[in-house]
Amino acid sequence: MDFTPPPIEDGFTAEKLFSQGFSYTYDDVIFLPHYIDFAADAVDLSTRLTRRLPLAVPLVASPMDTVSESAMASAMASLGGIAIVHSNVPAAAQASLVRAAKSRRVPILSEPAFAAPSAVIEHEDDFAASPFLLVTDIGAAGGKLLGYVAKRDWTNQKDKSLRVGDYMAPPPRRAPWNADLNKIHEIMENEKSGAVALERDGEVVDLVVREEVERVKGYPKLAAPATVGPDGEFMVGAAMGTREDDKERLKHLVKAGVNVVVLDSSQGNSIYQLEMVKYVKSVYPELDVIGGNVVTMYQAENLIQAGVDGLRVGMGSGSICTTQEVCAVGRGQATAVYKVSSIAYKSGVPVIADGGISNSGHIVKALSLGASTAMMGSFLAGSHEAPGAYVYQNGQRVKKYRGMGSLEAMTKGSDARYLGDTAKLKIAQGVVGAVKDKGSVLNFIPYTLQAVRQGFQDIGASSLQSAHDLLRSRVLRLEVRTGAAQVEGGVHGLVSYEKKYY
């Protein structure tokens, strides 16, 4: 790859563009095309989340309670990315979410409910969010599996007063916890069975049904390897705060096998976070810690000196975040990513561009401006794997999506992210909303990644590292888009249209 600046001066270098005193968002800037001598499919998107943790694809699910729990964590890991499980639950519950995601090697997680054979199912709520209920001798996890009841079978059961043991299906064939989809499907075909129980250390951890296997097998296939640790388990991250009781939370997470922790704060350049970084690195030196959030080089340098292994960049740029409006503090995300990356790379600290991602073009911009990964909230909210139930709003199928700075989220515990003390007056820095049903991340993320590859091809970058090299060697050029240019760059001039990306 040629990193010689073009002989004809055209556009601006990032250094010049971002030194003019303006705070730019992703939509404000546009990259100029460069020379192509490779196919889009040849673009290598492998990267690092932290100093020591590699990822096959540069995508991270945000630690929000309407985005990242067990299902999202297992799905993102299977795609080659990673999810950071939120901390808006008690420490033991968060550790259970981490354990659940790591207890299988398929992106299917039903989180089954349990019942004893003598139990009577009176309401569909007894199934929780699972499509079936496991029947064990003790009516809880850890007991002997006697059978299972599918929700649809219970719905069709005329006499709801019958005991579970009277109509449950027999226990299905078992498979090891780390069996892949092909192995599970093979067992189902050979046994003519509609379900397979996943077993680990003699205990059934989940039940996989044929409908789910066929659904997932029908999604696009990625060549990227899954994000798996040395122990063969999915890699999963988790968020934590900077208070004294978060040290106890950290113990639970480490015991659950967490691979990386994110110190979750809206303003990371604080004595509280600096001390927590040093504590984590001294007590658990093998555990990588990501600091943030930051938007300036000064903030970043302080956390780098404290020993962080990664930096989370963004303040007030999320779609549900009102920090810039309420507190008058923050920075345009494009400027923040470039500025922080320009100092972090000198220390070998990867940058996570957190917030402001609405489309694949924003991911291309974030990565090309120096970030190693893009963290997404609203982009993944509303998906099949996001927590919460679908509801209908004005005829549209939606899921709740809320900022961790919203009063609703802070009431559940996320105020630690925004308050350094126990202030009684809580000021919202986020809102509660809804996003439409997006389907499964296993379906739309592969298309998103292909769009990112095509964007990299257009700027002449055959890999994420080469994009960074082109940026820093002044080959990659940008311009600022006027309001009219932004309108022109989108769909315009039509009476009506249908926008489909894949």
From Swiss-Prot:
- Residues given in the record as IMP binding sites: 319, 354-356, 377-378, 401-405, 429
- List the keywords (alphabetical): CBS domain, Cytoplasm, GMP biosynthesis, Metal-binding, NAD, Oxidoreductase, Potassium, Purine biosynthesis
- Binding sites annotated in the UniProt record for NAD(+): 264-266, 314-316
| Pfam families membership | IMPDH (PF00478)
Pathway, per record = Purine metabolism; XMP biosynthesis via de novo pathway; XMP from IMP: step 1/1
Q: Which domain of life is it from?
A: Eukaryota
Q: Which reaction does it catalyse?
A: IMP + NAD(+) + H2O = XMP + NADH + H(+)
Known regulation of activity:
Mycophenolic acid (MPA) is a non-competitive inhibitor that prevents formation of the closed enzyme conformation by binding to the same site as the amobile flap. In contrast, mizoribine monophosphate (MZP) is a competitive inhibitor that induces the closed conformation. MPA is a potent inhibitor of mammalian IMPDHs but a poor inhibitor of the bacterial enzymes. MZP is a more potent inhibitor of bacterial IMPDH.
**What is any one GO biological process for this UniProt entry?**
GMP biosynthetic process
- Coiled-coil annotation reads none
E.C. numbers: 1.1.1.205
Q: Where in the cell is it found?
A: Cytoplasm
Catalytic residues identified in the record? 321 (thioimidate intermediate), 417 (proton acceptor)
The prosthetic group or cofactor this protein requires is: K(+)
The main location class comes to cytoplasm
Boundaries of every CBS domain copy: 168-224
Q: Which GO terms describe its molecular function?
A: IMP dehydrogenase activity; metal ion binding; nucleotide binding
Q: Which amino acid positions bind K(+), per UniProt?
A: 316, 318, 321, 488-490
Query: Signal as a keyword?
Result: no
**Enzyme class label:** oxidoreductase
| Recorded family membership | Belongs to the IMPDH/GMPR family.
Which function does this protein serve? Catalyzes the conversion of inosine 5'-phosphate (IMP) to xanthosine 5'-phosphate (XMP), the first committed and rate-limiting step in the de novo synthesis of guanine nucleotides, and therefore plays an important role in the regulation of cell growth.
Q: Which HAMAP family match?
A: IMPDH
Query: By its UniProt entry, which NCBIfam families does this protein fall under?
Result: IMP_dehydrog
Q: How does it assemble?
A: Homotetramer.
What name does the UniProt record give this protein?
A: Inosine-5'-monophosphate dehydrogenase
What broad taxonomic lineage does this protein's source fall under? Eukaryota, Viridiplantae, Streptophyta, Embryophyta, Tracheophyta
Q: Per UniProt, what is the name of the gene that codes for the protein in this document?
A: impdh
